[in-house]
């Protein structure tokens, strides 16, 4: 199975931000989308330089947000569309329709120090589809629990 990984560093605009921009001015919404696509295309050029996928793919999105402030659907709804449009614009995918994208799965994590989106593009008709389920089930390693402070002088008399 051919799988490709694309990492988009930073935070993409959410659906609410796009809707707000469109309501203010339709050109502002178009500008927001163009800026997001430009950032994504730069990442594609650096990471997927000569990749051209001409068969259906299954896509796994791993959304790493800096906090839980934005709701999950706001994070991924607009982001998926912009990412897929950038992949088509860069020539990695021929189109983003039903014939080219077999399905997608979203996973969400919090990483305050390194917000990003990891996109896996896996060919859908390749043998060894069990590795696709392994990718979906993958979890980042757990963070080490914080050590509790030893009681200080203030707490000693309690």
Residue ranges and their predicted role:
Residues 1-158:
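Catalytic phosphate/metal-binding cores of nucleic-acid and nucleotide-processing enzymes, i.e., regions
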């Amino acid at each position: 199975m051919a799988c490709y990984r694309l990492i988009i560093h930073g935070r993409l605009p959410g659906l609410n931000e796009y809707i707000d921009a469109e309501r203010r001015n339709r050109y502002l919404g178009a500008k927001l989308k163009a800026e997001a696509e430009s950032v994504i295309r730069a990442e594609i050029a650096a990471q997927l330089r000569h990749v051209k996928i001409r068969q259906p793919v299954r896509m796994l999105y791993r959304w790493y947000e800096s906090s839980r402030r934005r709701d999950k659907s706001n994070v991924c709804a607009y982001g998926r569309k912009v990412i897929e449009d950038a992949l088509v614009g860069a020539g990695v995918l021929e189109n983003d329709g039903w014939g080219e994208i077999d399905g997608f799965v979203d996973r969400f994590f919090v990483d305050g120090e390194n917000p990003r989106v990891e996109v896996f593009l896996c060919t859908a008709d390749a043998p060894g589809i069990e590795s696709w389920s392994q990718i979906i089930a993958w979890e980042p390693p757990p963070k080490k629990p914080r050590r509790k402070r030893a009681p200080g002088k203030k707490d000693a008399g309690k």
